[in-house]
Amino acid sequence: MSLQTVVEDIRDEARARAQEISDAADERAEEIIADAEADADQIREEREAEVERTIEQEREQRLSSAKLEAKQARLNARRDILEDVHGDVEDALAALEGDRREELTRALLDAAVDEFDDSDELSVYGRASDQSLLEDVLDDYDGATYAGERDCLGGVVVESNESRVRVNNTFDSILEDVWEDNLKAISDRLFEDQ
C-alpha cells in the first residue's frame, strides 16, 4: 500500500466522518427547528386561547355591567313611580273635604283618645286649615281642647298634660305605616306585568 493510498483512505474516512457529522448536525438542526416551530405553534395557540378568554371575560363583564345598569334603571324608574304614587296619595289625603274628612278625623281622634285615661286633660293639634273642624269635633270630648297647628296632611296629634304621652294619628303617620307595611304589595300590583 502506497503512501498515496493511505492518504486517500484517511481523506475518504475524514470526508465520510465529516459528512456523518454534517448529516447528524443537519438532522439535529431540523429537530431543533421542528421543536421550535412546535413550541411556537403551542405558544401561539396558548396566546390565542388566552386572548379569546380575555375577550370572552370582557364581553361577559360588559354584558353583566349592561344588565346591571338596565336593572338599576328599572329600579330607579320603579322608585320614581312609587314616589309619584305616594305623592298622589298625599295630595288626595290633603284634598279630602266635608264628611269624609270629618269621619277620618273623628276616627283618628277616637283612637288617640283611647290611649289616655278618662281624667287626662288633652291637647289636640292638627292641620291649620282643620282648626274649625277640630274645634267642632272636640265639643264632643270632655277634657280635650284644640291647642294649635301641626304641619301635616290632616288628622291629629294628641298630648296629655298629665303624662308625657303623645299620640301621632296624623294622616301622614298613618300613610307612612300603611305604606311601609304594604310597600311590597303596592309594588307588586303596580308592576305585576314586569
Swiss-Prot record:
Any one of the GO CC terms: proton-transporting two-sector ATPase complex, catalytic domain
Subcellular location as annotated: Cell membrane
Topological type in the membrane: Peripheral membrane protein
Biased composition (Basic and acidic residues): 41-56
A GO MF term: proton-transporting ATPase activity, rotational mechanism
Region of interest: Disordered: 35-56
InterPro entries: ATPase_E_C, ATPase_V1_Esu
Top-level taxon of origin: Archaea
Entry keywords, A to Z: ATP synthesis, Cell membrane, Hydrogen ion transport, Ion transport, Membrane, Transport
Function, as annotated: Component of the A-type ATP synthase that produces ATP from ADP in the presence of a proton gradient across the membrane.
Subunit structure: Has multiple subunits with at least A(3), B(3), C, D, E, F, H, I and proteolipid K(x).
Family to which this protein belongs: Belongs to the V-ATPase E subunit family.
Protein name: A-type ATP synthase subunit E
Natural source organism: Haloarcula marismortui (strain ATCC 43049 / DSM 3752 / JCM 8966 / VKM B-1809)
